């Protein structure tokens, strides 16, 4: 039976928007799915506008006919598809689509190769369950772009889909932190990998290469089972530091602190032992080293191993910070050839190409290792 569409013409109430699009990663009692859509199209019909935007409301129920995604597909097929040559569809959704809806979206996109779809979701629904993780991967594999809503998209929805009475969008305090956690989690689920050029440029340990102002952190997690460290493949990925932004992320957040947020978010069992290994393009600054040491003291079931490509020495106190980590029982070392290769094989979208070391990689690694040991032994203050 063809689902009856409900196309909400009236803009969303502000309280409805804040309640349903609040991006706290774990939320209950949100049983309504809101789908704000925009369709940019090329058409031979001059009476049709080039941009159509509106809202569908659906339910998180066992009957997928009542899901907002199904309403949209039915509406689009009946109203726009016959007149469209090319269409760019964007969904801003409060929850990501279920496996059934993903299958229907995949069929739709396969039937209409000139239609593209971007799904930007405020939250991830049941992302720890295998079926829902598989649904997200399948959605991405259909060619749809899947992403987490960022500050600009929340503001865009506020401006275009909410009866805001000309009031500006006021983000909740935890929006940036929640966004970062969800973005990294989605990267884990979709098994995102780093671009090869990005890896080589940011992880090179050649001191003559300048301009690496960002910090990348690759991580993997193992837990101790019967005396053996067993990989937790669902917790493996890479993190980029959140740059400071006067609007969306005023304070910024270093990659190490994003990792601590993520470990807390995983809710690892206190009765088990875990080992987190991170390969980072810059060693931690003093402030991050202090916070990492405090975190490990509060979470004795977690061990952290740090291997850095370069020593971050642009701020005072970096030596003290490295020694603080060492005293906290965190092994810290400089990356060697084997670790660069491991990162290339594990975290980089290398398309089957082997790791090609840059000139004097081993020499730079040895020099940096000697410098790190001198710091940890408190030589030269």
UniProtKB/Swiss-Prot annotation:
It is an enzyme of class 3 (hydrolase). Its cofactor is Zn(2+). Residues 206-333 are annotated as: Necessary for homooligomerization. CDD domains: cytidine_deaminase. This is DNA dC->dU-editing enzyme APOBEC-3G. Homodimer. Homooligomer. Can bind RNA to form ribonucleoprotein complexes of high-molecular-mass (HMM) or low-molecular-mass (LMM). HMM is inactive and heterogeneous in protein composition because of binding nonselectively to cellular RNAs, which in turn are associated with variety of cellular proteins. The LMM form which is enzymatically active has few or no RNAs associated. Its ability to form homooligomer is distinct from its ability to assemble into HMM. Interacts with APOBEC3B, APOBEC3F, MOV10, AGO2, EIF4E, EIF4ENIF1, DCP2 and DDX6 in an RNA-dependent manner. It is found in: Cytoplasm; Nucleus; Cytoplasm, P-body. Its main location: cytoplasm. Zn(2+) 1 binds at residues 67, 98, 101. PANTHER family: DNA DC-DU-EDITING ENZYME APOBEC-3G, MRNA EDITING ENZYME. The record marks 241 as: Interaction with DNA. It comes from the Eukaryota. It catalyses: a 2'-deoxycytidine in single-stranded DNA + H2O + H(+) = a 2'-deoxyuridine in single-stranded DNA + NH4(+).
């Amino acid at each position: 039976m063809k689902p009856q569409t409900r196309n909400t013409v009236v803009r969303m109430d502000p309280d409805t928007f804040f309640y349903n699009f609040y991006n706290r990663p774990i939320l209950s009692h949100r049983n309504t799915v809101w789908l704000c859509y925009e369709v940019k199209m090329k058409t031979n019909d001059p009476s049709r506008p080039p941009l159509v935007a509106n809202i569908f409301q659906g339910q998180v129920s066992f009957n997928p006919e009542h899901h907002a995604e199904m309403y949209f597909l039915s509406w689009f097929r009946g109203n726009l598809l016959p007149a469209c040559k090319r269409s760019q569809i964007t969904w801003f959704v409060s929850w990501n689509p279920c496996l059934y809806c993903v299958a229907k979206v995949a069929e739709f996109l396969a039937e209409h190769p000139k239609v593209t779809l971007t799904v930007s979701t405020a939250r991830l629904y049941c992302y720890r369950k295998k079926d829902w993780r598989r649904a997200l991967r399948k959605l991405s594999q259909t060619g749809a772009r899947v992403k987490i809503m960022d500050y600009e998209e929340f503001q865009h929805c506020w401006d275009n889909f909410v009866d805001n009475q000309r009031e500006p969008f006021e983000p909740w305090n935890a929006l940036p932190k929640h966004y970062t956690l969800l973005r990294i989690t989605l990267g884990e689920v979709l098994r995102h990998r780093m671009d090869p050029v990005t890896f080589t440029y940011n992880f090179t340990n050649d001191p003559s290469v300048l301009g690496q102002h960002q910090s990348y952190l690759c991580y993997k997690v193992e837990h101790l089972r019967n005396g053996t460290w067993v990989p937790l493949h669902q917790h493996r990925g890479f993190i980029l530091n959140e740059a400071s932004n006067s609007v969306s992320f005023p304070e910024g957040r270093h990659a190490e602190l994003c990792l601590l947020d993520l470990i807390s978010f995983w809710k690892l069992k206190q009765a088990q032992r875990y080992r987190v290994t991170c390969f980072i393009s810059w060693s931690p600054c003093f402030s991050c080293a202090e916070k990492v040491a405090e975190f490990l003291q509060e979470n004795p079931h977690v061990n952290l191993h740090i291997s850095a490509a370069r020593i971050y020495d642009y701020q005072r106190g970096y030596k003290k910070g490295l020694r603080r980590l060492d005293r906290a029982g965190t092994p810290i070392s400089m990356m060697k050839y084997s670790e660069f290769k491991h990162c290339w094989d594990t975290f980089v979208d290398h398309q089957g190409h082997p790791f090609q070391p840059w000139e004097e990689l081993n020499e730079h690694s040895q020099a940096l290792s000697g410098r790190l040991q001198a710091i940890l032994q408190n030589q030269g203050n």
